[in-house]
Regions:
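Polytopic alpha-helical membrane-helix bundles and their juxtamembrane interface segments
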Residues: 1-257
Length: 257
């Protein structure tokens, strides 16, 4: 049984190592709209490149579904890019409106999680239903406590810990997204890969957990009451992006492992 994390072949890893720091710098300084867009999309291409290269020799349902999930994620990254108008007012203290593009990004990422769910189930030697149910419920309870699911108007130690203010029209979409991402994480934790000789049994869980954690940073940035970009330090930006892009790379590494 392998205990090491397997990363995808090809130059994607080196591309991500090069572009991710540049994305963090561009985001932190907020001086280059082109830089943010360019380095974010290149970082997305990095985690997708490995599975795409393997697609010609690996035609398994697992490979196709993971690749589809990564493609949906790249599409989500594109939709979440700020418009030039949003970029020019990103340091404003005015309340920010959630754009149609952002909503499309949420839908794209939901599709990515659904693809991962089917991928994990398609390549599982066993599934623990008890662990599946427990993980799903625990994740939804955590989402409610953090304020992702129908948050109250005020933050407290027992509810809405992230101090989120989600508009009424966005609450149903965010709730459905929370259901889907909780399902993805629960399936990742409760399934065992068919091939344990080449991939760690915990690699799916690790990648899924990193993806889930990165979404909390997105939620805080999009819906937090005190989440203006100029109030985010470089460390917070680096952790959020690092969890997301390297989490996707970890998931991509399970293809052909």
């Amino acid at each position: 049984m392998s205990t090491a994390v397997s990363l995808p072949p090809g130059q994607g890893i080196y591309l991500l190592i090069a572009t991710l720091p540049l994305l963090v710098i561009s985001e932190f300084r907020s001086t280059s709209y082109v830089g943010i867009c360019l380095f974010k999309m290149l970082s997305s291409v990095a985690f997708l490149s490995g599975p795409l290269l393997q697609a010609s020799t690996n035609d398994s349902p697992y490979c196709r579904l993971i690749t589809a999930g990564l493609l949906f994620s790249l599409l989500g990254d594109f939709f979440l890019l700020p418009s030039r108008g949003d970029f020019s007012t990103r340091d404003s203290t005015k309340e920010r409106k959630i754009s149609v593009s952002f909503q499309l990004g949420v839908v794209a990422f939901a599709a990515a999680h659904i693809a991962y769910v089917f991928a994990f189930l398609s390549d599982s030697r066993e599934t623990s239903r008890e662990l599946l149910a427990t993980t799903f419920i625990a994740t939804m309870v955590l989402a409610k406590w953090l304020g992702v699911v129908y948050p109250p108007s005020h933050s407290s130690a027992s509810s809405n810990a992230l101090d989120l203010a989600i508009s009424p029209d966005m609450k149903p979409l965010v709730f459905v997204y929370a259901l889907i991402i909780s399902s993805m994480f629960a399936v990742a934790v409760s399934t065992v890969p068919s091939s344990l000789s080449t991939v760690s049994p915990y690699q799916r869980s690790l990648g899924a957990a990193m993806f889930v954690a990165s979404d909390l940073f997105v939620a805080k940035d999009a819906f937090g009451r005190s989440s203006a970009p100029n109030q985010r330090g470089w460390f917070r930006i680096a952790v959020g992006y690092g969890l997301y892009f390297w989490g996707q790379m970890v998931i991509a590494g399970t293809v052909g492992a």
